[in-house]
From Swiss-Prot:
Family per record: Belongs to the stealth family.
Molecular function per GO: transferase activity, transferring phosphorus-containing groups
Name the UniProt record assigns to this protein: Capsular polysaccharide phosphotransferase cps1A
Functional description taken from the UniProt entry: Part of a capsular polysaccharide synthesis locus.
Keyword Coiled coil in record: no
Gene name, Swiss-Prot/TrEMBL: cps1A
Pfam families with a match to the protein in the record: Stealth_CR1, Stealth_CR2
EC number(s) recorded for this UniProt protein: 2.7.-.-
More about this protein: Stealth proteins are part of a protein family that is conserved from bacteria to higher eukaryotes. Family members were first identified in microbes as proteins that help pathogens to elude the host innate immune system. Microbial stealth proteins are involved in the biosynthesis of exopolysaccharides. Stealth proteins are predicted to function as hexose-1-phosphoryltransferases.
EC primary class: transferase
GO biological process per UniProt: polysaccharide biosynthetic process
Length: 364
C-alpha cells in the first residue's frame, strides 16, 4: 500500500485521528516559552538528564545551594491595615494592577511549592522564606531545621518599609544572613513536578544556568500593554548597555532563577544610584528595575558566570479555559510514566478547590 493510500485509508476508518495528526503536524502544539513542540519535550528532558549524569560522575555532590522564596498572606489583618494605609495614595502613580488586592491573595501555594523542593531537590542546603512579619500556618509541621523565615526588616532598609513592591524586595535578596553564594529564587506559585539535580541550576565549576525565552520584549511593547515587568526589564537593559555590547530582546522563562550573591553585590556597586532611585516605590511602577528575574541573570551571563540551558516548563493561567486541558494532559503523562516537565507555574486567582487539585497532580 502506497503512502497516499495509507493516508486515505486512515481518513476513511479514523477521520478524527487523521485530522488530529494532520493538524498537529501542520500546527505543532507548544506548551512552553521555548521553540520546541510538545513532541520534542520528552527527548529534550532525557538529553539534559543524561548530560547531567555524565557531569555528576566527574564531580562531587554540591551542598552549597540555597533556595529563596518571597511570600505574602494578603488575608493577614496586620498586613491589610498597612495595605489600606498606603494603597489609596499610590494607586494613581503605580503601574497597571500594582495595587490590585488580588496580587497579594494566598491560596496556600507556598505549602506545595516548599514541599516540592523538599521532595524533589533534597540536595538544597537551606530554604529561606522572605515575609512581612508573617508565618505560614503549616510551618511548625514542616522540617524547620531546613527552613528560615526572613522578615523584610532583616534585609531592607527601614526607610523603604513597608513595601508592597516585589521589585524592591528582590533587590535585597543578597542581604539574607548566611545565604550561600549560589541560590535559586522561587516565587510561591512555582511547583517542581519531578526530581531535579543540582546541575540543572549550577555546574560544579560554579557556572549557573540562564533559562532564556523565545519571546520578544519588542513584540510585547508593540502590543500596547506596558506592564511593570516589561518596563523594569527595559530599564535593566539600558543599564547593562553601559558596560556590555548587548542586543537583548529576550525575557527569561517564567521559572525559578539561579542567582549569585556576588553578582548582586556587583550590580549594587555599579548601579547604586539607579537602584536607590526606585526603592521608595511602595507598589510596582514603570520606573522599577527587574532585579532577580532579569538584571542579575543577564549580568551573570555577560560576566561569564552563566550559560543558557533548556528548562521545559508549563505556564498556567487557570482563569483560562485551556487550564483544565493542560492539567489533564500532565496527569495522563504521569499515569503512563512519561517524563514530566521540570515544573509548572500557575496564576492562582480562582476557586481554591481547583487550585488544590491541580497542584496535587504535580507533586504527589
Amino acid at each position: 500500500m502506497t503512502k497516499m493510500n495509507r493516508k486515505f485509508s486512515k481518513l476513511l476508518k479514523n477521520p478524527h485521528i487523521f485530522f488530529r495528526d494532520f493538524l498537529n503536524k501542520k500546527y505543532p502544539i507548544k506548551n512552553t516559552e521555548l521553540p520546541f513542540s510538545e513532541s520534542e519535550e520528552a527527548n529534550l528532558i532525557e538529553a539534559n538528564q543524561k548530560l547531567d549524569k555524565i557531569i555528576q560522575k566527574n564531580t562531587l555532590q554540591q551542598t552549597n545551594i540555597d533556595v529563596v522564596f518571597t511570600w505574602v498572606d494578603g488575608s493577614d489583618p496586620s498586613w491589610q491595615a498597612k495595605y489600606s494605609q498606603y494603597a489609596p495614595n499610590y494607586q494613581a502613580k503605580s503601574a497597571l494592577y500594582a495595587t490590585d488586592i488580588a496580587r497579594f491573595e494566598d491560596h496556600n501555594e507556598l505549602y506545595y511549592s516548599v514541599h516540592a523542593v523538599l521532595k524533589y531537590m533534597p540536595w538544597v542546603r537551606h530554604i529561606f522564606i522572605i515575609t512581612d512579619n508573617q508565618k505560614p500556618k503549616w510551618l511548625d509541621e514542616t522540617r524547620q531545621e531546613k527552613i528560615t523565615l526572613i522578615d523584610h526588616q532583616d534585609i531592607i532598609d527601614k526607610e523603604y518599609l513597608p513595601t508592597f513592591n516585589s521589585h524592591v524586595i528582590e533587590a535585597f535578596l543578597h542581604k539574607i544572613p548566611n545565604l550561600s553564594e549560589n541560590f535559586i529564587y522561587f516565587n510561591d506559585d512555582v511547583f517542581i513536578a519531578r526530581e531535579l539535580q543540582a546541575e540543572h541550576f549550577f555546574q560544579a565549576n560554579g557556572i549557573a544556568s540562564i533559562f532564556m525565552s523565545e519571546k520578544s520584549l519588542t513584540q510585547m511593547r508593540n502590543r500596547g500593554t506596558i506592564t511593570p515587568t516589561l518596563s523594569a526589564s527595559e530599564y535593566s537593559i539600558r543599564l547593562l548597555n553601559k558596560y556590555y555590547n548587548t542586543n537583548i530582546d529576550s525575557p527569561l522563562v517564567h521559572t525559578y532563577i539561579p542567582l549569585k550573591k556576588s553578582m548582586y553585590e556587583l550590580a549594587w556597586r555599579r548601579y547604586e544610584k539607579e537602584i536607590l532611585g526606585f526603592l521608595p516605590n511602595k507598589f510596582r511602577t514603570n520606573n522599577d528595575l527587574n532585579f532577580a528575574n532579569f538584571l542579575i541573570p543577564w549580568l551573570m551571563y555577560f560576566e561569564g558566570k552563566a550559560m543558557p540551558k533548556i528548562d521545559i516548563c508549563y505556564y498556567f493561567n487557570i482563569r483560562s479555559p485551556n487550564a483544565l486541558t493542560q492539567y489533564k494532559k500532565l496527569l495522563n503523562k504521569k499515569n503512563i510514566g512519561e517524563q514530566l516537565i521540570h515544573f509548572a507555574q500557575m496564576i492562582l486567582i480562582v476557586k481554591k478547590v481547583l487550585t488544590t487539585i491541580k497542584i496535587n497532580c504535580f507533586l504527589f
